[in-house]
A protein has these predicted regions:
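Loop/turn positions that initiate beta-strands
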Residues: 1, 125, 177-180
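Phosphate-backbone binding interfaces of nucleic-acid-interacting proteins
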Residues: 1-76, 190-191
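Active-site lining segments that contact anionic ligands and/or coordinate catalytic metals
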Residues: 33, 151, 178
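Active-site-adjacent structural elements in folded domains
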Residues: 40-43, 100, 167-168
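Glycine/proline-enriched, intrinsically flexible loops and inter-domain linkers
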Residues: 63, 67-164, 171, 182-187
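Short beta-alpha junctions and helix-cap segments that line functional grooves
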Residues: 167-169, 177-178
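Residues that scaffold, gate, or flank divalent-cation-dependent active/transport sites
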Residues: 174
Length: 191
């Protein structure tokens, strides 16, 4: 917390042994940052601007500069993986993608990822939550990670009546019949 990279003040930050004593922490982690405040009224109407890459594309177009392309990975090699039990049960949802990851042994995010999330107003939680939040900020695509031991049958649907739902931030929200929910079978687990 003292060096301005996290709200976490619970303990001592570990720095690898290859960093010499007395090294400025700014040379170890990406702490210094430039903040652009963009008053963009079209953000809500332009989903392509919801992420950092979309904003960068807009800036590149306005400045007449080339945009560094994203590295694209061929996902077809994952086509043979076992399918996740997922069904879209409402035409309001046009697409929902998911993949199951196993054998994740690391739970703590890299420090630079936690720093970037902190600068974007988000707190680090764990590796998978931080990764989905990081990608959401980068690409503008909301994501969520579920524990496959607890969520077995993903269903995307609406409910006939409104109900209360407590989100991860602890806020109880009123969900109306027009809101798509991600469910474990018939039990809502996310909006």
């Amino acid at each position: 917390k003292e060096v301005g990279i996290s709200d976490d003040n619970s303990g001592i930050m570990d720095i690898t042994e290859d960093v010499a004593n007395g090294t400025d922490i700014k040379n170890v982690y990406e702490i210094e940052d430039i903040v652009f405040e963009v008053d963009n009224k079209s953000l809500t109407n332009r989903p392509d601007l919801w992420g950092h890459y979309g904003i960068a594309r807009e800036f590149a177009a306005l400045a007449g500069r080339p945009l560094k392309p994203l590295e694209v990975v061929d996902l077809s090699k994952y086509d043979s993986l076992p399918k996740v039990d997922m069904k879209i049960e409402d035409e309001l949802c046009q697409r929902y993608s998911c993949i199951k990851l196993d054998n994740i042994t690391k739970n703590v995010s890299p420090v630079n990822m936690r720093i970037r999330l902190f600068y974007c107003g988000m707190r680090g939680i764990n590796l998978l939550a931080d990764l989905t939040n990081y990608l959401m900020l980068e690409m503008g695509q909301p994501m969520h990670a579920f524990d496959s031991r607890k969520v077995e049958k993903l269903r995307i649907k609406r409910f006939d009546e409104s109900f209360s739902f407590t989100t991860l931030d602890g806020i109880e929200r009123n969900i109306d019949e027009n809101t798509l929910m991600i469910c474990n079978g018939d039990i809502p687990v996310a909006i």
